[in-house]
Structures are given as structure tokens and as C-alpha cells.
Amino acid sequence: MAPCTLLLLLAAALAPTQTRAGPHSLRYFVTAVSRPGLGEPRFIAVGYVDDTQFVRFDSDADNPRFEPRAPWMEQEGPEYWEEQTQRAKSDEQWFRVSLRTAQRYYNQSKGGSHTFQRMFGCDVGSDWRLLRGYQQFAYDGRDYIALNEDLKTWTAADTAALITRRKWEQAGDAEYYRAYLEGECVEWLRRYLELGNETLLRTDSPKAHVTYHPRSQVDVTLRCWALGFYPADITLTWQLNGEDLTQDMELVETRPAGDGTFQKWAAVVVPLGKEQNYTCHVHHKGLPEPLTLRWKLPPSTVSNTVIIAVLVVLGAAIVTGAVVAFVMKMRRNTGGKGVNYALAPGSQTSDLSLPDGKVMVHDPHSLA
């Protein structure tokens, strides 16, 4: 198995998953960043249920604590938050050690800034059986080591990671991870879905429209927007006379809108005057049927254009008449001689280690 680079996973925040009948996912993303001369490495951990961030820990906070990031998590009592805070602080120490160990493996100096990351969690189906478990690590933005889909073996990305793999294989760490992913991870996902049922199991249909962006005298860009939808799983495609233009589209990753919903757009360059031949198709579970959109010059714009053109013609005629009358009058007043004029003054014109128990716990084995 080739693990996905965690920087890309973090940038994307979370791969889209469906809600209601399933599948569902629980995932944690953890990052430790060394900063020589500025104190201890910064440690950040965030947790997601499906497409929603629900917990966070930041070692740079005034009072570093595991805290809720979704209103429904406030139902958990003080004991839960205290326990998770202690686990996060324990994991913070593990990541600091791992950063130093990785620097040694790669023969790096202590003067540079480095990043160690981890993503772990589980995907479950509608029957609550495990579909996929994750334990992936990255160093300086590159894959380091990952638990394979069989949850029994590891894939090391390079010779440095081979050292860690041998150590973890000897210690039987894969078995420990597997027990968590098949058991407690699934149970905690069920718990969080119960707490956030109204939010996590909702469906917000996208609001879609097409915008027009001139490029040159021969072509334009048509951009199809989908806004305010949840969950994040959505498909936008452009078609020309019924044929998909997937290879010719510019497609951005689905992005959080900041209000619990998501947004996305897809663009295609088309010949000027051929805009009507292109259609955008939007597929989302919140829609009773897929949307089909086409760029059209709004009727109001056509009417306004006609009105403006008429007004321009009338205005030009009025101005021309006024100028002619003014000149004729001045010529009469001056006996046909021209008059010189001068302008008056001023008249110019947008975690964790090996889980155990609930969410987080210190790994029994570091990279060393």
C-alpha cells in the first residue's frame, strides 16, 4: 500500500464521506513542528467526524487544553476533557522525541525547522463494521511509515523509516493499532454520531450558478459554482453537447465555507459565442435530482442593454444639439469670431500517538 502524503491530507482537511446510512469516519490529524530558538515544538491535534471538526488541542494556546470545536461536543463532561487533555500532553512529549529521532535518522542539523505528522482513524459502513483503518506518519511533508490495509504489516517509505518498521514489528505494535481501530475507534465514532446527530446527519443541498469571465477576444471562462452544501461529497462536471469535459476542466478541491457547509467550483474555457453549448452538471445527495446549468445572458441584462443603448443615442443627440445651439449663439454674440476659454482654478477633473481507551494515549514505542 502506498500511503497518502499527510500534508495533502491536512490541506484537504478530510476526504469526503457520506452521512446518514453510512459510511462514516472518525479521523485525527496531528502535527508537531520544531522551531529552533523559539522554544519547544508546537503540537496541534484536531479530530473530525465525517466532514466536521469536533475537537482540537494547540500547545500554543494560553491554557493548552483539549477543547470542543462543535457545539454538540459540549455535552461531554469535565472528566472527558481533562482525560483527553492529559493524553494530548503525553502525546506532545512523544512527538518531540520522535522529531529528534527523525532528525538523527536523516543526519539533519538541529538548526532547521522540521515537521512530524500523523493521521489515524476508521471508516465504517452502514452495518458499523470496519471498512478501513488508518495509521499513517509523515516527516517533513513526505510519507514516512504507514499501517497497511490488512492492519498487520507496515510500509516504510525510505531507509530511515525501515529502522522504525523493524522496531515496531519486533514490538508487535501493528496488533495494538488493529485492536484500537476495530474496536474502540468504531465505538467512539458511534458515540460522537449520537451526540451530533442533528448536525452530522443533516443534508444541505448546494446552491449552484454559472459565472462568465472574459479571457480574450476569442474565448471566455465559464465557472460553475456550488455553495452551502453538506456533506462535502459532491460532483461537478462540464459537458459539451452531452460529452464530459473532465480532462479540460479546472477543478478546485472542496473547501469549508466556515459555517459548517462546503463550496466548490469547476471551470472550463470555451470559444466566444459558443457558451450555450456547454452545460454544468451538479450531483449531491441533498438534491432530488442532478442540476443542469447553462450560462445565459440574463433577460434583465438584455433589456438594460437595449435601454442603455437608446439612452446613449438620445443623449448624444441632445448633447450635439446643445453644442450646436451654444456655438451658434456665441457666434452671433461675437459677430462670428471665435472665443477663447480657460478652466477656472480648481475645475480640473482561510495528534496524536497510539490511541488507547478513548482517543489519545502515549505510544509505547517511539521512533528511536
From Swiss-Prot:
Task: Supply one GO molecular-function term.
Answer: MHC class I protein binding
**Metal-binding among the record's keywords?**
no
Question: Which Cys pairs does UniProt list as disulfide-bonded?
Answer: C122-C185, C224-C280
Q: How does it assemble?
A: Heterodimer of an alpha chain and a beta chain (beta-2-microglobulin).
Q: Which Pfam families match?
A: C1-set (PF07654), MHC_I (PF00129)
> PROSITE patterns from the entry?
IG_LIKE (PS50835), IG_MHC (PS00290)
Domain Ig-like C1-type, residue spans: 206-294
Xref: SUPFAM superfamilies: Immunoglobulin, MHC antigen-recognition domain
Query: Does the keyword section mention Phosphoprotein?
Result: yes
GO cellular component terms, semicolon-separated? external side of plasma membrane; lumenal side of endoplasmic reticulum membrane; MHC class I protein complex; phagocytic vesicle membrane
- Return the protein name: H-2 class I histocompatibility antigen, K-D alpha chain
Glycosylation sites per record: N107, N197, N277
Q: Where in the cell is it found?
A: Membrane
- For the region Alpha-1, give the residue spans: 22-111
GO-annotated biological processes:
antigen processing and presentation of endogenous peptide antigen via MHC class I via ER pathway, TAP-dependent; antigen processing and presentation of exogenous peptide antigen via MHC class I; defense response to bacterium; inner ear development; negative regulation of neuron projection development; positive regulation of T cell mediated cytotoxicity; T cell mediated cytotoxicity
Positions in the Extracellular compartment: 22-305
**Which segments cross the bilayer?**
306-328
- So which stretches are on the Cytoplasmic side? 329-368
Matches recorded under SMART domains: IGc1
The chain residues annotated with the modification Phosphoserine are S350, S353
For the region Alpha-2, what residue ranges are annotated?
112-203
